[in-house]
Amino acid sequence: MFSKNRNINQFQYAMESQTEFIMYIPDAINSLIHLLDNGSIIPECFKPNLTDINGFVGNLRHLPNKITSIETGLIRQVYFHGDIMIAGSVMYLKDIETLEFICKNIGFRLSLFVEWLYDNKSLHLLESIALSFPSNDVSYLLESVMQYRQNDTTKLIFNMFPSEYNKEIILRNAVITNNLEMLEFAIEKGAILSETDHLIVQSIRTSNLDLIKYIFSHIDLSKLIKLTDTVYYIYANAVYHYSHDVIVFLIESCIDYPDDLLFKLFASNQDCHETIDYIINLKYPDQNELNNILIHICRHSSQSEKYKSVYNSVEKLIELGADFTIDNYQVVIDILKSYFPNVVEIFVKNGLNPNVNPNILKTSIYCCNNFDITKYLIDNGADIHSDPSLIKTAITSGNLKTATFLMDNGAICDESDCEIITKNRHIFDNNFS
């Protein structure tokens, strides 16, 4: 008894003082070997320090003559406190017996275990230990392996544990991971797709036309087209995860597209011009539809991620006949309030007179606060001589450069505003020729 306590004390001292180098401390190694060989358990004080113990186990491969007894004791007593990498350390040692022990008790840590196998190019070892997994864990094992697109390993595990539930696991994960080979495998094994299955919508998100065609060939399209909500979400996802070929396939499969498809294409941040042209050739939009799309694009352009997308959409809509004069030119004012005020150039090029609504110039000064846009409007005929509030608006918005330009070009300026501009003129002198 005295000897055992002495060994524990030696090992505990080594763990607490210099854990990362414990394998190089002969007394500590000998004490641990003695404890394990005599059936002792690892003292509780070591178990919380899993990182250190894991490092110790990982270094055991440097002691080939002492691997089995040390590793088995440590793994079986400490592993289940949650450190998956202890299992990883065993993989270096290729100790199948201990691995099988882990597999039988792995539970919720299984996905981490598979991740470690994948990272260390050791997934092939599952062939040797798969039968050690409890049947309840096999579905989790299949899901974990499929995340890494290990098709051969997935097939092998399924053939070891064939079941209706496991077919569905493979079917679902094949679509989620965009894996046509495993989708075909699941269908060949008898997995069934229905028209109401959420996987149909999920498949659209892959933008993989071959996978989508395969799924649609295994469902009843005559039933699908009657499911209005499902069809709506199919097209919504086809736009969000944009693929021209997928949208064309859906339409050519006689799946009627929703009324707002053209609207969604214009509102997308993707370059959807090819599909827009395709839809317009099928059915030319009426004036009201074009106007509503233009209103939305201009009003919500600040939510867009790309200037080019907004510019191209507005340009195309004007080309198609959208009326930018509606609601007293509100779309022009909306675009001036956005992150992309340069789009106003499209309206000017298509005949906009900046004076038709005095708020156009004032918005460019106050909301847009962009000197180049204001100058562009003035260069294209915007009147700066009638409204006495323009310079004050520029000063209030902090745009002294615009205020100076307005004053120098004859805009009405009261004495206090002129004084402010004069005091700050030296800042802008270099900006004017």
Curated annotation (Swiss-Prot):
Q: Which UniProt keywords apply?
A: ANK repeat, Repeat
Disulfide pattern? none
The record's section on SUPFAM superfamilies has: Ankyrin repeat
UniProt-listed InterPro entries: Ankyrin_rpt-contain_sf
Q: ANK repeats at which positions?
A: 166-195, 197-224, 356-386, 388-415
Q: What is the name attached to this protein's record?
A: Putative ankyrin repeat protein R578
Q: Which organism is it from?
A: Acanthamoeba polyphaga mimivirus (APMV)
